[in-house]
UniProtKB/Swiss-Prot annotation:
One of its GO terms (biological process) is cell division. SMART domains: PDZ. Residues 152-162 have a biased composition (Polar residues). This is Partitioning defective 3 homolog B. Belongs to the PAR3 family. The modification Phosphoserine is found at residues 100, 346, 352, 368, 635, 710, 728, 730, 746, 749, 801, 1088, 1182. The keyword Cell cycle applies. InterPro entries: PAR3 (IPR052213), Par3/HAL_N (IPR021922), PDZ (IPR001478), PDZ_sf (IPR036034). Putative adapter protein involved in asymmetrical cell division and cell polarization processes. May play a role in the formation of epithelial tight junctions.
Length: 1203
């Protein structure tokens, strides 16, 4: 779908996809594309007021494009543009004598607006003079147009009360207990001058006693509007009381009985009034003479400024409003206009530049719901004869799109302001045409009907038979239903407004309406103003406001009517009577200002602050009342704003509304958009009463919820009012995010508390926004759930959790968080204390981290070993922390339930320390994990330890693997008898801890027996035996460890300097000897690895830049507990790596030398190929059968390096 938006002579084609975007979005896209065509002028400025059809109808910015525009349609942009630093003409030809917007210029202009009538001339056209509409000339300082020149002084003006509200006693019209509609009609009819009414009627006084009058009466319908004006005397019986006394004549109309107007009363109500009056001794009837009937029908519409007060608004005491609890419906009222004839000017100059109109077929018909039916059932047939004059028949027709059954029915679209239809007054918008001059038009196309009508010559009469739908939209009556009103009598004020229509062209009144409907019963409760459209008559008048309830139009009450009937009444008045006079009279109900006491109770705005705000608002209204009602404008430099302006009329009692300001100030005042984002709307094509359900009317106008594009906004009337009271206290105040409410080391508890407080603030039921929970409220939670964090990283992650949860709440908090809530203040204070505690703990954690880093830097370990240890430690940590899940889950539940207590903080602190200590212990165990190795000695098969056959054997190797010494080349220490060294700090692990570790791998724990002196006992011999068994097992599996080709140096079985033992996992091992852990860690538990992995590895790939192990010492020694010197051992010479490390003197040994493993072969021997390795048998004893020993000594042995 594509739409062309015309900026003067420039057409901008805007692709709209499937047309599901709003008119407002189309306007923005068109503006952006138009500005791109003016890139050569960086100072060029454009402001779009609204979009129009080519025949003049204004598009509502809230409408969905596909519902109001067809594919490839043309729309006209009404806009202001400004060339940089020069005078230009806008497309309509009006001089745009101002430069691009400037804040200082606007401020100065606003101050001068009240004194200088800059450019406020009134355009007078011949059609305005012909129409007879009096020309009202005023100074720009006058607040409103003066009274009608021909208007007779009203009772209010005669009594000198022209500027005061006219308060009518509501008890004077309650002689009967009929519906309030009659009372309202009486109030409206009393507005007309008595002298004018007495000229057209005669008073007849009769006695209530005696014989019946003997008259036959029927409803008196107006020929102009179809309204019921009274009782029409159709006949008089012979020899009746009326005939004898000459009281009445046929064709006379009774319009008033005992000061009770019969205007808009149903026939039954009028009869009842008559019967009640006849029970009194004297009855006064006002009878309308036949010759004055037409004049009376026009006078019902109402003269200009019937009260003569300057603001043209009467304030009467709360007439009965429509009933109400919401469930609203909306109808967009814009009239499509007449294609011909000049339009008369009005007293107010149009602020929008006039743009050229292009001829266009009607694409947006404005019809009644009859178009949606097309059936003649329940329709009343009316025959109407129209005499074609020089101005034509004066109406337009429209039809549906063609269907499979042929052309659709043809309807009357609009009644033009000139022509035979408006003079006759019976034809209405929405009537279905059945016959023309006796010929049935059913099944004929619109073109054929138009040709038939145009074939009528001037002076001839066209006979039409039309069908008018009646009664099908009335709601069913519920007996005993209590009357509930949307605006109560005490809390609303009634205003009568006369709004000129002529200068708005075909834009009409320019309002979008919404219908209120009871949710419980479905009863219609009245129509309200949804929004004021820029460029329309209501916008230029500036007195109508959003959420005003319409109770009467042109003197015709809307009370008691269904929403559909009220819409039709308003449309009819717009299309016929309003165009005759160029003026429309509206009676509205408006919610008055809220008392200051009620506002001050809300706590956020004190009385002095409110009075200052009220004073500022009244000043701004005095200068420009339309600032509250602009619909929306666009400027490339300005972003659209949503301004919360109070529409309650706080200062309205003292300051009458003023006319709109000069166009030069318009840009600054209209850059604020009234957001109507409290409705979720359903749109339908054209105007066959496009009802849309919106939110309740009971909310005040300054509630400005964010517009939601989702459909999850379901209004909750119970919450709206309370929320409105809380929000209304500071209409212009911005609520900032209260980030302090979400800072806590226990995020779950605070987030839950805040969510509980806030969920009652939302005025609608919607799926709760995703509450961003932290990755964990504390370390215990993370320890139980998330195993990927280390200690110090957990603190950082907590900080990130705080940030993420804060950002998740910001949008909701801006809308609904109340200010000054004492409960939330307490939460915030507690949160700050918790934050301080947490920061201290973070500092401690960072200190521990630095100590660890220092130790790690001192140790020359390769990156591969660190990665393995970290991953292995995480696995162990997972198993270890598994035991504490139950306690931590309970802890988490306690945190969620409320605010953190002091005991909980202590628990959290202890938990953190405990986890840190265990984590460090596990890291140390990884570093000093007990290594298994094998020596090359054969042994019997039956000596194999049954650990290897145990299916539950976990093969966990590195519980006690030590970190490398800071210096491998330290001078040897003398052998010192003593207990075996455990970790590097010398602390032996607790038996309970070791038993827990053994339980993880399903192995029994056999603690070593220690003598009182700490020396190893007989268990050492057992460990040596098991070590020998493992060595034999390795030999049987084909491993020759560090063998030379010719010799094999083997340790003495009784050499006590070699001490073997059984580790926690059940494997035999050599306890820690200084500097030997690298070789030990490289020894396999059994099983061969894939040789290909080792053939393809680089020689130094497994060392990762760490130093190669170098063991020049002749014999191994125990790990010393002190720094005692070690006795030299000269039994062996150093044969390892002779080309790199020449053998040092015997007395300069720097480290232990393994007796059980012979030196590695020289470097020059070749590395065998894969085929040779594959041929090596598992039990071959020849050195050539084990090619893996022929390798670069700098490369770790591939068969022993696997962990």
């Amino acid at each position: 779908m594509k739409v062309t938006v015309c900026f003067g002579r420039t057409g901008i084609v805007v692709p709209c996809k499937d047309g599901q975007l709003r008119v407002r979005e189309l306007t923005q896209q068109a503006l952006q594309r138009y500005l791109k065509t003016r890139d050569q002028d960086p100072g060029y400025w454009v402001k779009i007021h609204h979009l129009e059809y080519t025949d003049g109808g204004i598009l509502d910015p809230d409408d969905v494009l596909a519902d109001v525009v067809e594919d490839k349609d043309k729309l006209i942009a009404v806009f202001d543009e400004q060339e940089p630093l020069q005078k230009t003409e806008s497309p309509g030809g009006n001089p745009a004598d101002r430069q691009s917007p400037d804040a200082f210029e606007t401020e100065v202009a606003a101050q001068l607006a009240a004194f200088k009538p800059v450019g406020g001339e009134i355009v007078v056209t011949p059609s305005a003079l012909k129409l007879g509409t009096p020309l009202l000339v005023r100074r720009s300082s006058d607040p409103a147009p003066g009274p009608h020149a021909d208007a007779q002084p009203s009772t209010a003006s005669l009594s000198g009360q022209s500027l005061k509200p006219v308060v009518l006693d509501s008890t004077q019209n309650v002689e009967n207990k009929e519906a309030m509609n009659g009372e309202q009609a009486g109030l409206l009819s009393l507005h007309r001058p008595k002298d004018e009414l007495s000229d057209m009627t005669r008073a007849v006084e009769i006695s209530g006693e005696g014989d019946p009058l003997g008259i036959h009466v029927v409803p008196f319908f107006s020929s102009l509007s179809g309204r019921i004006l009274g009782l029409f005397i159709r006949g008089i019986e012979e020899n009746s009381r009326c005939k004898q006394e000459g009281l009445f004549q046929e064709n006379e109309c009774i319009v008033k009985i005992n000061n009770v107007e019969l205007l808009d009363k149903t026939f039954a109500q009028a009869q009842d009034v008559f019967r009640q009056a006849m029970k009194s001794p004297s009855v006064i009837l006002h009878v309308l003479l036949p010759q004055n009937r037409e004049q009376y029908e026009k006078s019902v519409i109402g003269p200009l400024n019937i009260f003569g007060n300057n603001d043209g608004a009467s304030r009467t005491k709360a007439a009965p409003p429509a009933r109400g609890k919401p469930g609203l419906k909306a109808v967009h009222l814009t009239r499509a206009s007449s294609p011909e004839g000049e339009e008369p000017a009005s007293p107010q100059q149009s602020k929008s530049p006039r743009v050229p109109r292009l001829g266009r077929k009607p694409s947006s018909p404005s019809l009644s719901p009859l178009m949606g039916f097309g059936s003649k059932k329940n329709a009343k047939k009316i025959k109407i004869d129209l005499k074609k004059g020089p101005e034509g028949l004066g109406f337009t027709v429209v039809t549906r799109d063609s269907s499979i059954h042929g052309p659709g029915p043809i309807f009357v679209k609009n009644i033009l302001p000139k022509g035979a239809a408006v003079k006759d007054g019976r034809l209405q918008s929405g009537d279905r045409i059945l016959e023309v001059n006796g010929r049935d038009v059913t099944g004929r196309t619109q073109e054929e009907l138009v040709a038939m009508l145009r074939s009528t010559k001037q002076g001839e009469t066209v006979s039409l038979v039309i069908a008018r739908q009646e009664g099908s939209f009335l709601p069913r009556e519920l007996k005993g239903e209590p009357d509930c009103y949307a605006l109560s009598l005490e809390s609303s004020e009634q205003l009568t407004l006369e709004i000129p229509l002529n200068d708005s062209g075909s834009a009409g009144l320019g309002v979008s309406l919404k219908g209120n409907k009871s949710r419980e019963t479905g009863t219609d409760l009245g129509i309200f103003i949804k929004s004021i459209i820029h460029g329309g008559a209501a916008f230029k008048d500036g007195r109508l406001r959003m959420n005003d309830q319409l109770i009467a139009v042109n003197g015709e009450t809307l009370l008691g009517k269904s929403n559909h009937e009220a819409m039709e009444t308003l449309r009819r008045s717009m299309s016929m009577e309003g165009n005759i006079r160029g003026m429309i009279q509206l009676v509205i109900l408006r919610r008055p200002e809220r008392p200051l006491e009620e506002l001050s109770e809300c706590g956020a705005l004190s009385r002095p602050g409110f009075e200052n705000c009220q004073e500022a608002l009244s000043t701004s209204r005095r200068n420009d009342s339309s600032i509250l009602y602009p619909f929306g404008t666009y400027s490339p430099q300005d972003k659209r704003k949503d301004l919360l302006l109070p529409s309650d009329g706080w200062a309205e009692n003292e300051v009458p509304p003023s006319p709109p300001p000069h166009p030069a100030l318009e840009w600054g005042l209209e850059d604020f958009s009234h957001s109507s984002g409290v409705d979720s709307t359903g749109y339908f094509p054209d105007q066959h009463v496009n009802f849309r359900t919106v939110t309740p009317v009971r909310q005040p106008e300054l509630i400005n919820l964010k517009a939601s594009k989702s459909m999850d906004l379901v209004p909750d009337e119970g919450k709206v009012q309370s929320l409105a009271d809380r929000r209304s206290d500071s209409p212009g105040k911005d609520f900032g995010p209260t980030l302090g409410l979400k800072k806590s080391s226990s995020l779950e508890s605070l987030q839950t508390a805040v969510a509980e407080v806030r969920k009652n603030d939302l005025p609608f039921h919607r799926p709760r926004p995703h509450m961003v929970r932290g990755r964990g409220c504390n370390e215990s939670f993370r320890a139980a759930i998330d195993k990927s964090y280390d200690g110090p990283e957990e603190a950082d992650a907590d900080g990130l959790s705080d940030k993420s949860s804060r950002s998740g709440h910001t949008a909701l908090n801006c809308e609904s968080a109340p200010q000054g809530n004492p409960e939330l203040d307490n939460v915030e204070n507690k949160a700050k204390n918790i934050k301080k505690t947490k920061e201290k703990e973070k500092k401690k954690g960072k200190g521990k981290l630095k100590v660890k880093e220092k130790k790690l830097k001192e140790e020359h370990e390769d990156a591969e070993r660190k990665m393995k240890r970290k991953g292995f430690g995480a696995m162990l940590r997972f198993g270890k922390k598994k035991d504490d899940k139950v306690g931590k889950a309970e802890q988490k539940g306690a945190q969620k339930s409320g605010h953190p207590e002091e005991e909980e903080l202590e628990r959290m602190k202890e938990e953190r320390e405990r986890i840190g200590a265990k984590h460090q212990e596990l890291r140390e165990k990884q570093a000093r994990g007990l290594v298994d190795y094998a020596t090359a000695v054969t042994g019997p098969v039956h000596d194999m330890d049954d650990d290897e056959m145990d299916p539950n054997y976990a093969r966990v190797n590195h519980f006690r693997e030590p970190c490398a010494s800071a210096n491998v080349f330290r001078s040897p220490s003398p052998l010192r008898a003593g207990p075996l060294a455990y970790p590097r700090d010398g602390r032996p692990l607790s038996p309970d801890h070791l038993e827990g570790l053994y339980a993880k791998v399903n192995k029994p724990y056999h603690p070593p027996a220690l003598a009182d002196s700490g020396r190893p006992m007989a268990g050492t011999t057992d460990r040596i035996q098991k070590l020998r068994k493992e060595y034999y097992q390795a030999r049987r599996e084909g491993f020759l460890l560090y063998e030379d080709e010719n010799t094999r140096a083997r340790p003495s079985d009784h050499d006590l300097r070699w001490v073997s033992g059984k580790g926690p996992d059940g494997s035999t091992h050599n306890l820690r000897f200084e500097g030997m852990e690298r070789q030990y860690a490289s020894l396999p538990r059994g099983g061969s690895a894939d040789p290909v992995d080792y053939l393809t590895a680089s020689p130094r790939g497994r060392y990762n830049d760490r130093e190669l192990p170098y063991y020049p010492g002749p014999h191994p020694v125990h790990a010393p507990r002190g720094s005692y010197p070690r006795p030299p051992d000269l039994r062996a010479t150093d044969l390892r790596y002779p080309q790199y490390y020449p053998p040092p003197p015997a007395h300069q040994h720097k480290g232990p030398f393994r007796q059980d493993v012979p030196p590695s072969p020289p470097q020059h021997q070749r590395v065998p190929v894969y085929q040779e390795m594959g041929r090596a048998g598992p039990r071959g004893s020849s050195p050539d059968q084990y090619p893996y020993r022929n390798q670069d000594p700098r490369q770790k042995n591939p068969m022993t390096a696997a962990v």
